[in-house]
Regions:
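Secretory-pathway-linked proteins and extracytosolic
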Residues: 23-34, 151-155, 159-165, 172-221
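Lumenal/extracellular ectodomains and adaptor appendage modules
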Residues: 22-151, 157-172, 207
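A sequence-composition feature that detects small, non-aromatic residues
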Residues: 7, 101, 214-216
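Bacterial Sec-dependent N-terminal signal peptides
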Residues: 1-25
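Homeobox/homeodomain signature
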Residues: 15-17, 125-128, 202
Length: 221
């Protein structure tokens, strides 16, 4: 049986853009008290949020897409070298504009800026398609919060797979519309709906997903 992934498909219908600053600049670290739930998985997602913004340059007619991912994850066990790495795809990406990380444990909170993250690129595992950042000194029980943003060329259509290889308590998808219309379709989810919100002072659409299961590596037949 073919594995069904939870997928969003986005269609831009009418394009008319404001010239506000990019919203990724105003996404802050999570300030809520972290509520943990028992899990047998090596990793447990507290949240995994996606932001997509279509942005018109202030100085030219060019339009870009800024995609931000903001995650907070509990490390229960480190059984895989990938558990302490951040892998960012560069496929169809013109620029990685920001990468930040925060490591939280019982005693300390350590934050890494974009300049510090650049020094953590693992050149052996990075190539023209992916950047691999290796976070230092991670221990079991740590909570890792990550934010990164990539810049892409404009495209009328887009899609996003929401699930990960570990369970996620909460996931949000926010499409920052500004002054254009969009059409979002949700596939393989029966309890999630699109709602209109104002995000960073801009007209946006939001979808909330609760208690996402981990994806599995399955054979196709």
């Amino acid at each position: 049986m073919k594995k069904k992934f939870l997928v969003l498909k986005i269609l831009l219908i009418v394009s008319y853009f404001n010239t506000y600053s990019q919203s990724y600049l105003n996404i802050d670290w999570d300030s809520d008290k972290t509520i943990l739930f028992p899990s047998d998985n090596d990793l447990y997602g507290i949240f995994n949020n996606h932001y997509v913004e279509y942005f018109k340059s202030k100085f030219t007619e060019e339009v870009y897409v800024y995609e931000t991912r903001h995650t907070k994850t509990k490390i229960n066990r480190i059984n895989n070298p990938l558990d302490n790495e951040i892998i960012i795809s560069k496929i169809n990406v013109s620029e990685i504009v920001d990468v930040r990380a925060k490591i939280i444990n019982q005693d300390t909170i350590i934050s890494y800026s974009f300049d510090e993250m650049k020094k953590m690129i693992n050149s052996d595992d990075s190539d023209e398609n992916y950047n691999n950042y290796k976070l230092p000194n991670l221990d079991e029980g740590d909570i890792v919060e990550i934010m990164y943003t990539v810049k892409k060329d404009f495209n009328f259509n887009g899609n996003k797979i929401i699930e990960e290889s570990y369970p996620i308590l909460l996931s949000k998808f926010i499409l920052i519309e500004n002054n254009f219309k969009s059409n979002i379709k949700i596939y393989n989810s029966n309890n999630s709906f699109v709602s209109d919100i104002i995000f960073d002072g801009k007209k946006s659409k939001q979808i909330i997903f609760n208690n996402l299961n981990a994806t599995a590596n399955e054979q196709y037949s």
